[in-house]
Amino acid sequence: MGGLLIKQLSTEEDRVVVIRFGHDYNPECMKQDDILASIAEKVKNMAVIYVVDITEVPDLNSMYELYDDCPTMFFYRNKHIMVDLGTGNNNKINWALTNKQDMIDIIETVYKGARKGKGLVNSPRDFSPQYKFLKKKKKKKNKKKQKKKIKKIKKKIKNN
């Protein structure tokens, strides 16, 4: 099975090959599969999407370090394309994305970069935990500012 997959990678010349490794019964993989299935038609000119059960390709498990629940990897002309998502692991996406547009944007970035000969592309969005923390912190500050503004407006209304 692993050899067949490698052959398929080498036959695709003009599109990115997106492979979701994992188990079909895994809830994380099910989420990722739903996202991938829903965008397949939109990205058909840029990418072809495969789902691979890691129990079927044990030789690839060690080669690509497929130890996570739901890794997704990108290949172009039989070459692994890495994506800097801000998480420290550029080899693969280790979680199920919940936003269709995020996956479309990542595939488009991989496609454009790979066509230019790049082996590593930067994700259009930062998925680092630090960024998520800062974003939440900013939201809290914004809520406080909004409450202050509302109080000022209410005071102005009372005074008028």
Curated annotation (Swiss-Prot):
Query: GO BP, one example?
Result: mRNA splicing, via spliceosome
Highest taxon, organism lineage: Eukaryota
Q: Which UniProt keywords apply?
A: mRNA processing, mRNA splicing, Nucleus, Spliceosome
Q: Where in the cell is it found?
A: Nucleus
Q: Where are the residues of the annotated region Disordered?
A: 132-160
Per the record, the similarity remark reads: Belongs to the DIM1 family.
Write out the function statement from the record.
Plays a role in pre-mRNA splicing as component of the U5 snRNP and U4/U6-U5 tri-snRNP complexes that are involved in spliceosome assembly, and as component of the precatalytic spliceosome (spliceosome B complex).
Summarize the subunit comment.
Answer: Component of the precatalytic spliceosome (spliceosome B complex). Component of the U5 snRNP complex. Component of the U4/U6-U5 tri-snRNP complex.
What is the protein named? Thioredoxin-like protein 4A homolog
Report the source organism: Dictyostelium discoideum (Social amoeba)
Q: Which gene encodes it?
A: txnl4a
